[in-house]
From Swiss-Prot:
ATP binds at K253. Its main location: cytoplasm. NCBIfam families: gltX_bact (TIGR00464). This is Glutamate--tRNA ligase. One of its GO terms (biological process) is glutamyl-tRNA aminoacylation. It comes from the Bacteria. Catalyzes the attachment of glutamate to tRNA(Glu) in a two-step reaction: glutamate is first activated by ATP to form Glu-AMP and then transferred to the acceptor end of tRNA(Glu). GO terms for cellular component: cytosol. Monomer. Belongs to the class-I aminoacyl-tRNA synthetase family. Glutamate--tRNA ligase type 1 subfamily. Its cofactor is Zn(2+). It comes from Myxococcus xanthus (strain DK1622).
């Protein structure tokens, strides 16, 4: 029987949760849940200049907002703890010392200046720089240097061999040993580099499948050589397609603000919509576009991941977000809308109009921010600024007379409901022998300032009885 599936997401906490990282985490999470496996969260926090507790928290916040929960990791300590690389330095040192003792790694005393000079020579010759093995056979440090100054390099096997692996997404990939050099495993300060630390951790944490972005394909070859040197069986690999920005360049923290998961939360995107959007950047299920978490859990498999880069399409994300705002229970949307209203100075919790507001505005809004902006500008304020062009057309002459008739009828209306208010429009329309649109537009302009709004009954309910009558009275003063 094969070992139980164990997958991991291992970000470097140097800032916010990147969209590419969120997709990697999501796919690993889905595969683990689908197969009854374990999803591990590990922090590769070895960049001491940039890794901060705030960045760790930003990643945790992003995953929590998306609803991607882990089985082991920060806050959920398991049998393979600790889950921060900086708390595992003794483990890396132990395995580095073992490789040195077995002649499979060595201390390198070359300075940055030495390597820069060698790199310049290679570039002038038109070739790529490869470490020439200057310290490969050294048994003692050169004069003036000691072991504390040395990095530790992996000793690539001599000869014309090759290394290959079969990727679950990309198929079989091969490189010759001559394409690889003696790469640095440990820095002089005892901190492991990526290729070394992740292999040690993946093995000791019993990770059975490593799924990560295609930018890590070339890292897989030195990692496989390390597995071989340590006598370990490597996990399976799946490399996921790149995500490109709208400019078709790799989605980057420096160039693309949309790379930050939490930007979308602040913009009023629903987590269901963002998950739906990112899963389809490299994976699809037939012609299905709106895909729920439950459907992802049923359908997703790494073997179905494509190889073509996904391109960020902001219009598609907004479309999906509108679909999700319309599909989710109105109570859920109301709860998520409240912080956006509060940010605009509107304390609306418990306001009986909120459910009607959401039902009405989500049909014509792309984000929670859109709904909140419309609510603040039209429904949760005193008075309204009229669009002069709309007012000139719809608040003069016969239109104003129709509005007066509406005002008179509203005064005596016992029930301020959508049905009753729509009935007023119909009543005035029939009594005046004009179409309902002729009656509705003056009301709409008086209430909202322009010619577009939800239905008249809904708009009157949202503005409220007292404020509606005040706005209509203000409009009638134009006559």
């Amino acid at each position: 029987m094969p070992p139980a599936l164990r997958v991991r997401f291992a970000p470097s906490p140097t800032g916010y949760l990147h969209i590419g990282g969120a997709r990697t985490a999501l796919m690993n999470f889905l595969q683990a849940r689908r197969q009854g496996g374990t999803f591990v969260l590990r922090m590769e926090d070895t960049d001491q200049g940039r890794s901060t507790p705030e960045s760790v928290q930003a990643i945790l916040d992003g995953l929590n907002w998306l609803g991607i929960d882990w089985d082991e990791g920060p806050g959920k300590e398991g049998p393979y703890a600790p889950y921060f690389q900086m708390q595992r330095l003794d483990t890396y040192r132990k395995h580095a010392d073992q490789l040195i003792a077995e002649g499979k790694a060595y201390r390198c005393y070359c300075t940055k200046e030495d390597l820069d000079a060698q790199r310049q020579v290679a570039e002038k010759a038109g070739g790529a720089f490869k470490y020439p093995g200057t310290c490969r056979e050294r048994t003692e440090p050169p004069a003036g240097r000691n072991a504390a100054d040395a990095v530790i390099r992996f000793k690539m096997p001599a000869g014309d061999g090759s290394v290959s692996f079969t990727d679950k997404a990309l198929g079989t990939i091969t490189k010759t040993h001559s394409d690889l050099d003696d790469w640095v495993m440990m820095r002089a300060d005892g901190i492991p580099v990526y290729n070394f630390g992740c292999v040690i951790d993946d093995h000791l944490m019993d990770i059975t499948l490593v799924a990560r972005g295609q930018e890590h394909v070339n890292s897989t070859f030195p990692q496989l050589m390390l597995y071989q040197a340590l006598g370990w069986t490597p996990p399976d690999f799946a490399h996921l397609p790149l995500i490109l920005g709208p400019d078709r360049e790799k989605l980057s923290k420096r160039k693309h603000p949309e790379a930050d998961v939490m930007v979308h939360k602040r913009n009023g995107v629903m987590p269901e919509a963002l998950l739906n959007f990112v899963i389809r950047l490299g994976w699809s299920h037939g012609n299905d576009e709106v895909i729920s978490r439950e459907q992802m859990l049923e359908w997703f498999d790494f073997s179905d991941v494509g190889t073509t880069s996904g391109v960020w399409n902001p219009e598609k994300l907004l479309w999906l977000n509108q679909q999700w705002m319309k599909q989710l229970p109105v109570e859920t949307v109301v709860e998520r809308l409240l912080p956006f209203l509060e940010a605009k100075g509107i304390q609306a919790k418990g306001d009986p109009r909120l459910e009607t507001l959401v039902r009405t505005l989500r049909e014509r809004s792309n984000t929670l921010e859109d709904i909140a902006t419309t609510a603040a500008n039209v429904y949760f304020r005193s008075g309204i600024t009229l669009d002069e062009k709309a007012a000139t057309k719809h608040l003069s002459g016969e239109s104003l007379n129709l509005l007066r008739k509406v005002r008179e009828t509203l005064t005596a209306l016992p029930e301020w409901s959508v049905e009753a208010l729509d009935g007023v429009v119909k009543q005035v329309s029939e009594a005046s022998s004009v179409g309902m649109g002729k009656v509705a537009q003056p009301i709409r302009v008086a209430l909202t300032g322009n010619t577009t709004s939800p239905g008249i009954g809904e708009t009157l309910v949202l503005v409220g009885r007292d404020e509606s009558l005040l706005r209509i009275d203000a409009a009638l003063t134009r006559g």
